């Protein structure tokens, strides 16, 4: 009976640790308890074959790829907790595997390399104003601008 109690305590402590860690955005070292602004970032391809990012925000609004379009400008307010949900929706071809990533260097936002239909969520705190580039390290044409005001 005592062993079961210790086991339950270990499970609770481990769960509490991971719950606490999930509250810490990638660019700060303390927990942030705010409702995040959710931004869905999807990889896409324009009609002329160029790779790009599309986005949809919990604030509404959607941008669809157009021929020759570069990636959208994202605007958020300083002090917001932002949750990026990144998904690679570009299918593999017989000659090439689809791999993409998403990065904002100034905020330590770096996704893993995502294969077809893989996804990842990353939280960061928009704690400084300015204009910051976001990009895919594998495809230089996949880039855009993040504005924090």
What are these regions (language model features)?
Residues 2-149:
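Extracytoplasmic copper-binding redox domains, predominantly the cupredoxin/blue-copper superfamily
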